C-alpha cells in the first residue's frame, strides 16, 4: 500500500487475516465467533495530518515512511474523505504563491465530517500577525466560494488563532435516530465515521434490555455514552480532557438527553473516589452511591486498563470493552476472565490495509 494507492482488491483477504488473528488471540478466553464489521474500502478516514515540503517554487504534502523515515509526496489520499482530498488541492493552490501564508508553514491538519464540514489547522514556525490573519481570512473566503464548508485555524508556538470556530458538528444515524456530535480541533474523535456508526449500533445491540445505570470511563465527547443513554436509566461518564468535556456537555444539550452526567476526572481518580480513598471537589453535589450501575463501559487508550481499574470494573455484572489494541485487551482479560465470561465479540475494521484492529467484547459475570 502507498498513500496514493489502496489495494482495494485485497480488502477481503486482509480482513479475513484479521479475523483469524483475533480468533487466535481470543481463544484462551473461550470467546464466541466474532461479529465482523467491514469498512468502506476507500475514503473512510475523516481526519489526516500532513507535513509540508517546500521544494523551490513547489509546495506539497508529505508523510514519512515508518520504517525508513524517508519522505513520501502525497498529492491525493484515497484513504481520506473526499472532502479532505478536495481541501488538500485547494489549500495548496491558495497558499503556494502567497508569501504570507506560505512562509514557515510546516504542517496542515484536516478534520471533516459526514455532514460535509471541515476544520483545517495550519501550523507555523513563526509568529502569526495581523497580516497573516488578513490573508488567512481571504483564503477561507475563497475556499467557501468554492462550496467548501471550512473553518481555518492558525497555530504557532503558544498561539492559536480561530478565524471563526475550532469545531464542527457531525450528524450520525444511530439506531434509527440522528445523533449530533461536536468535534473539536486537536481533540480525539473516531477516525472512521462509517465504522463509528457500526460500533455505536453494536454497543446498542449488546446492551439492549439492560437494567440499571451505566458507568463509562474515558468518554471523550460522549460518543458512546450519549448513544447508549436510551438503553439505561442514567449514565455517569468520566473524561479528563477539558475540550472533550465541553464538547460532551454541548452534545448532551444538542441531543436533548437528560439522563447523562459527565465528570471531569481520570479513570484512576474515579477509581479512588469509588473506593473512598480520596475525596474530590469536582464530585460535590454528585452522589456516586445513588447510581445503580450494573454495566460499565470502557474504551481505554492503547495501553489498556491499569491494574486498579481492572479490579474496579470486575465489581460490575456486565463489562462492555472497546479496544484499539487487542494485545492489551488480552492482557486485561487474563484478570477479567477470572470473574467474567466473554459473551459477545466484534471486530471493527477501523483501519483497513493496516495491522491495526479495533474490537469489542461484552463480558458477563460468571
Curated annotation (Swiss-Prot):
Question: Which EC number(s) does UniProt give?
Answer: 2.1.1.-, 2.1.1.35
Q: List the disulfide bonds.
A: none
Coiled-coil regions listed: none
Binding residues for S-adenosyl-L-methionine, per the UniProt record?
190, 218, 223, 239, 299
CDD domains membership: AdoMet_MTases
EC class (word): transferase
Task: Tell me the keywords, alphabetical order.
Answer: Methyltransferase, S-adenosyl-L-methionine, Transferase, tRNA processing
Entries under Pfam families matching the protein: tRNA_U5-meth_tr (PF05958)
The answer to whether keyword Zinc applies is no
Read off the InterPro entries from this record. Answer: MeTrfase_TrmA_AS (IPR030390), MeTrfase_TrmA_CS (IPR030391), SAM-dependent_MTases_sf (IPR029063), TrmA_MeTrfase (IPR011869), U5_MeTrfase_fam (IPR010280)
User: Which Gene3D superfamilies does the entry link to?
Assistant: 2.40.50.1070, Vaccinia Virus protein VP39
Molecular function in Gene Ontology: rRNA binding; tRNA (uracil(54)-C5)-methyltransferase activity, S-adenosyl methionine-dependent; tRNA binding
As its record notes, the protein acts as a catalyst of: uridine(54) in tRNA + S-adenosyl-L-methionine = 5-methyluridine(54) in tRNA + S-adenosyl-L-homocysteine + H(+); uridine(341) in tmRNA + S-adenosyl-L-methionine = 5-methyluridine(341) in tmRNA + S-adenosyl-L-homocysteine + H(+)
Q: Which residues form the active site?
A: 324, 358
Q: What GO cellular-component annotations does this UniProt entry give?
A: cytosol
Signal peptide per UniProt:
none
Listed GO biological process terms: tRNA methylation
The UniProt family comment states: Belongs to the class I-like SAM-binding methyltransferase superfamily. RNA M5U methyltransferase family. TrmA subfamily.
Cross-referenced HAMAP family: RNA_methyltr_TrmA
Function summary: Dual-specificity methyltransferase that catalyzes the formation of 5-methyluridine at position 54 (m5U54) in all tRNAs, and that of position 341 (m5U341) in tmRNA (transfer-mRNA).
Protein name listed in UniProt: tRNA/tmRNA (uracil-C(5))-methyltransferase
Q: Name the species this protein comes from.
A: Klebsiella pneumoniae subsp. pneumoniae (strain ATCC 700721 / MGH 78578)
> Gene that codes for this?
trmA
Amino acid at each position: 500500500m502507498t498513500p496514493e494507492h489502496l489495494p482495494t482488491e485485497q480488502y477481503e483477504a486482509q480482513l479475513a487475516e484479521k479475523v483469524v488473528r483475533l480468533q487466535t488471540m481470543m481463544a484462551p478466553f473461550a470467546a464466541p465467533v466474532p461479529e465482523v464489521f467491514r469498512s468502506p474500502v476507500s475514503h473512510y478516514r475523516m481526519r489526516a495530518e500532513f507535513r509540508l515540503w517546500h521544494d523551490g517554487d513547489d509546495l506539497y504534502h508529505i508523510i514519512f515512511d515508518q520504517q525508513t523515515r524517508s519522505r513520501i509526496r502525497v498529492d491525493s489520499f484515497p484513504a481520506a474523505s473526499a472532502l479532505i482530498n478536495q481541501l488538500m488541492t485547494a489549500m495548496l493552490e491558495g497558499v503556494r504563491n502567497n508569501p504570507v501564508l506560505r512562509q514557515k508553514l510546516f504542517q496542515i491538519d484536516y478534520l471533516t465530517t459526514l455532514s460535509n464540514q471541515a476544520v483545517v489547522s495550519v501550523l507555523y514556525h513563526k509568529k502569526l500577525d495581523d497580516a497573516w490573519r488578513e490573508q488567512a481570512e481571504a483564503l477561507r473566503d475563497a475556499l467557501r466560494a468554492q462550496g467548501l464548508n471550512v473553518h481555518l485555524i492558525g497555530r504557532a508556538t503558544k498561539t492559536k488563532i480561530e478565524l471563526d470556530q475550532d469545531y464542527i458538528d457531525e450528524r450520525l444515524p444511530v439506531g434509527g435516530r440522528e445523533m449530533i456530535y461536536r468535534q473539536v480541533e486537536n481533540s480525539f474523535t473516531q477516525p472512521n465515521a462509517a465504522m463509528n456508526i457500526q460500533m455505536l449500533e453494536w454497543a446498542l445491540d449488546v446492551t439492549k434490555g439492560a437494567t440499571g445505570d451505566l458507568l463509562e470511563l474515558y468518554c471523550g465527547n460522549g460518543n458512546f455514552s450519549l448513544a447508549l443513554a436510551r438503553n439505561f436509566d442514567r449514565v455517569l461518564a468520566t473524561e479528563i480532557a477539558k475540550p472533550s468535556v465541553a464538547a460532551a456537555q454541548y452534545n448532551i444539550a444538542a441531543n436533548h438527553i437528560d439522563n447523562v452526567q459527565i465528570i471531569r476526572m481520570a479513570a484512576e481518580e474515579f477509581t479512588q473516589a469509588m473506593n473512598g480513598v480520596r475525596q474530590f471537589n469536582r464530585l460535590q453535589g454528585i452522589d456516586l452511591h445513588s447510581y445503580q450501575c450494573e454495566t460499565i463501559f470502557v474504551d481505554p487508550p492503547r495501553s489498556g486498563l491499569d491494574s486498579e481499574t481492572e479490579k474496579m470494573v470486575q465489581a460490575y455484572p456486565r463489562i462492555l470493552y472497546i479496544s484499539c489494541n487487542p494485545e492489551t485487551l488480552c492482557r486485561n482479560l487474563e484478570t477479567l476472565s477470572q470473574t467474567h465470561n466473554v459473551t459477545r465479540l466484534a471486530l471493527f475494521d477501523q483501519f483497513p490495509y493496516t495491522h491495526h484492529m479495533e474490537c469489542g467484547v461484552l463480558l458477563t459475570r460468571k
